A protein has these predicted regions:
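Walker A (P-loop) phosphate-binding motif
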Residues: 87-147, 191, 230-232, 239-250, ...
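N-terminal leader/targeting and accessory segments in enzymes
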Residues: 1-86, 226-233, 237, 246-326
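Conserved beta-strand scaffold positions in the cores of enzyme catalytic domains, especially
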Residues: 75-77, 100, 119-122, 157-160, ...
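A conserved, hydrophobic alpha-helical segment in the catalytic core
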Residues: 191-224, 298-306
């Protein structure tokens, strides 16, 4: 990109007229700057600017007034760096006619669990990686994000993933594995709950537009089960008739409540969550350890908690049990 275009798009102030006319790439890390790069300084550090120059940066973008130490470098100051990045993103998206999609948490989980074709850029809370991909010759075909506010700023014409109208035949009684038929292909005993299958199919339908084929799917990091005994001892996966289903995403937790209530008899299901969430559930707790006092006549307990924290509690409980035996 030419320096004069960069200044115009970001509405920045160029501190002098350097002999360098354009940049070849971009970096947000002074330690990763290459010769010809634009260094975008988010920490407003003069030391970071000096390091970027010594690494070969051709241009510097910052919202801090800096000491110009090299007359051959394009020093560009903006009033608001985040706003400047939004303007850059909007420029690239508009000029390259890049499609943008708002995805929900379930769809994002499916994307994360699959191998993905080249050209998909996922935005979370920062535009850094997207800006780097634009400048560093990584062709972006599609932008996807759960963050609607960000999409409104950089791609106001964003869409939802297209809906697949093809009927999906699900023949799975398990809560944790799925067998179904879609688009003439049988998917047998996939390690995901039927709860996620509509989203899974939607993502598959979307990915058919790319050079991509399904190979496998990694276990999802939500709606995770811990099988237990009546005395709350952990069992290997699938080896018991009772299970804790653990979720830490509040939006998914609320959806999972409705799903489980549609699949399980009321007498077999208990919903538990921290008191701080102020939800209408069967059991509220202040400390996660309190779940060990629950009545295990229930077959399934949907629990709002961090999975790793819960595993640590079980390990501690088992360790204390072993110590009392000696």
């Amino acid at each position: 990109m030419r320096i004069d275009n960069l200044v115009r798009i970001t509405q920045g102030e160029l501190y002098q007229t350097p002999s360098i006319a354009q940049i070849d790439g971009v970096s947000f890390d002074p330690d990763r700057v290459k010769s010809g790069d634009l260094y975008i300084c988010k920490n407003n550090s003069q030391e970071s600017l000096k390091k970027a120059i010594s690494s070969g940066a051709y241009a510097l973008l910052s919202e801090k007034t800096f000491d110009v130490t090299d007359k051959e470098i394009a020093w560009i100051k903006v009033e608001d760096l985040e706003l400047a990045l939004i303007k850059l993103a909007r420029y690239f998206i508009a000029t390259n006619k890049i499609d943008s999609y708002l995805i929900n948490p379930k769809e994002k989980l499916i994307f994360d669990a699959l191998s993905k074709p080249k050209g998909l850029s996922f935005i979370e809370n920062s535009l850094d990686k997207l800006i780097e991909s634009f400048f560093n010759s990584k062709k972006t075909l599609v932008i996807l994000s759960e963050n609607e506010d960000t999409l409104k700023q950089i791609a106001p014409n964003y869409k939802a993933l297209p809906t697949c109208n093809e009927e999906v035949f699900i023949s799975s009684k398990s809560l944790f594995y799925s067998t179904f038929l879609f688009n003439g292909k049988a998917f047998n005993a996939l390690p995901i709950s039927p709860f996620f299958i509509p989203s899974f199919v939607k993502v598959l339908f979307f990915l058919q537009n790319f050079e991509w084929s399904f190979s496998n799917i990694k276990p999802l990091t939500h709606f995770r089960a811990i099988f237990i005994t009546k005395k709350f001892r952990m069992l290997p996966f699938g080896m018991g008739e009772k299970a804790l289903i653990v979720e830490e995403n509040l939006k998914l937790f609320k959806e999972e409540i409705l799903y489980l209530k549609s699949r399980i008899c009321q007498k077999d299901l208990l919903i538990a969550a921290p008191k701080s969430l102020n939800l209408e559930v069967d059991f509220e707790y202040d400390a996660l350890e309190e779940i060990f006092n629950l009545d295990t006549r229930f077959k399934y307990i949907l629990l709002f908690a961090n999975y790793e924290d819960l595993l640590s509690l079980f390990e501690k409980k088992d360790s204390n049990k072993e110590l009392t035996l000696f």
